[in-house]
């Protein structure tokens, strides 16, 4: 019984850490028909499909992504601001294993967009 409780405690303590440590993979915008692929080893994300704006496929939308050393599940980098035509500061967080929040910042204004992890692009 003690071993079973210890195993359960370990699973509860270490599972969120394992999930929050990896944002690599394919993500779908929660509201729009757009998909990105994050390659954390390259520190970037590229549009792999966008049904509304197909000309954006192949565009690098996130770059210079680096893990926050003081907070697990948080990354900082740059996001491409379409209307400005340049990269701006971004904060990426992983509140759940399959849910990502991307918060772009321009001056004192910010916008957060939710993305959902997917296995395939459909």
Set out the residue ranges of the language-model regions.
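Bacterial N-terminal signal peptides that target proteins for export
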Residues: 1-7
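N-terminal signal peptide c-region/cleavage motif recognized by signal peptidases
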Residues: 15-17
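Central antiparallel beta-sheet cores of small beta-barrel/beta-sandwich binding domains
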Residues: 23-89, 116, 120
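Short, exposed beta-strand-loop hairpins at the edges of beta-sheets
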Residues: 91-112
């Amino acid at each position: 019984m003690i071993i079973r409780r210890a195993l359960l405690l370990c699973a509860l303590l270490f599972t969120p850490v394992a999930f929050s440590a990896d944002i690599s993979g394919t993500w779908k915008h929660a509201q729009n028909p757009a998909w990105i692929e994050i390659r954390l080893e390259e520190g970037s994300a590229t549009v792999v499909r966008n049904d509304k704006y197909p000309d954006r496929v192949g565009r690098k939308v996130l770059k210079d992504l680096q893990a926050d050393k003081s907070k697990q599940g948080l990354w900082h980098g740059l996001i491409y601001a379409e209307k400005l035509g340049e990269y701006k500061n971004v904060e990426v967080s992983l509140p759940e294993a399959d849910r990502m929040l991307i918060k772009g910042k321009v001056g004192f204004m910010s916008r957060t967009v939710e993305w959902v992890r997917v296995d395939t692009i459909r």
